[in-house]
Amino acid sequence: MASDGRVERIASSIRAIPNFPKPGILFQDITTLLLDPQAFRDTTDLFVERYKDKDITVVAGVEARGFIFGPPIALAIGAKFVPIRKPKKLPGEVISEEYSLEYGTDKIEMHVGAVQPNDRVLIVDDLIATGGTLCAAAKLIERVGAKVVECACVIELPELKGRDKLGDMPVFVLVQADESV
């Protein structure tokens, strides 16, 4: 990782909010990162530097905050951007993948044909916690025959062991955060 101060600037620009959205949670708020143009640029630059020579053809952003970081990365590396959304948000034909939550299940979707079998895909989200959403996104991509090159997140909550759920899928994160209040 770059030792030029960018990661430290990014980490210091992320606000931790205790007891949000419920008691006992320390919420990692990236909106303060977005308010700092240099930290925001550093974030996208670090991802671009990592992926510019990896022949990525698709950057898939996971709703909602993957939509913030994914498009500038896609533009900079010459890849298309594909949104992976919550159910019933995309018009037209979609494919979906269900995944488990702490209580119950949820689902994510993408347009049929948005990702092709020969595509090399980077999945982008703001944070990896339990790994459920990223795992579902990877399954969705792999179901159409494409290759997930890596999952890229700004923040990781290592205590929640999200990488374990992803198995041997490569994951790259900029900031390790503490989840305890």
UniProtKB/Swiss-Prot annotation:
GO cellular component entries: cytosol
Membrane-traversing stretches: none
GO biological process, one term: purine ribonucleoside salvage
Pathway membership, UniProt: Purine metabolism; AMP biosynthesis via salvage pathway; AMP from adenine: step 1/1
Main location: cytoplasm
MF terms in GO: adenine phosphoribosyltransferase activity
Keyword Transferase attached: yes
Compartment list: Cytoplasm
EC code: 2.4.2.7
UniProt catalytic activity: AMP + diphosphate = 5-phospho-alpha-D-ribose 1-diphosphate + adenine
CDD domains on file: PRTases_typeI
Keywords: Cytoplasm, Glycosyltransferase, Purine salvage, Transferase
Subunit field text: Homodimer.
Family: Belongs to the purine/pyrimidine phosphoribosyltransferase family.
Main function: Catalyzes a salvage reaction resulting in the formation of AMP, that is energically less costly than de novo synthesis.
Protein name: Adenine phosphoribosyltransferase 1
Organism lineage: Eukaryota, Viridiplantae, Streptophyta, Embryophyta, Tracheophyta
